[in-house]
Amino acid sequence: MEFVTTETVPGREITESLGVARGNTVKARNVGRDITQSIRNITGGELKAYSELLTDARDDALDRMAEDARSMGADAVVNVRLESSEIANGGSEVIAYGTAVTLA
């Protein structure tokens, strides 16, 4: 499954647009990590535990978007976008979406 952030797949012809493919996930922070990350926030530097959490969430959202696109019979997803938001109790939601297409 190919993902692109552009409207077309370079070197390929889109034969059909199948609709929106999407995938999302919600990840919660760990209380123990919050304590160590709070200290890092005071002293400065990357909050690695949070970076890893968001990387995992993005990967999961993209995997779920790919599953959704495959279920529609897609070869690729164009115009891929990722959005994230904080939800209750320190959880983070990441959604991936784009247009599922078939290619010649």
Swiss-Prot record:
A Pfam family: YbjQ_1
SUPFAM superfamilies reported for this sequence: YbjQ-like
Gene3D superfamilies the record matches: Hypothetical protein apc22750. Chain B
Family listed: Belongs to the UPF0145 family.
Identification of the protein by name: UPF0145 protein VNG_2432C
Species the sequence originates in: Halobacterium salinarum (strain ATCC 700922 / JCM 11081 / NRC-1)
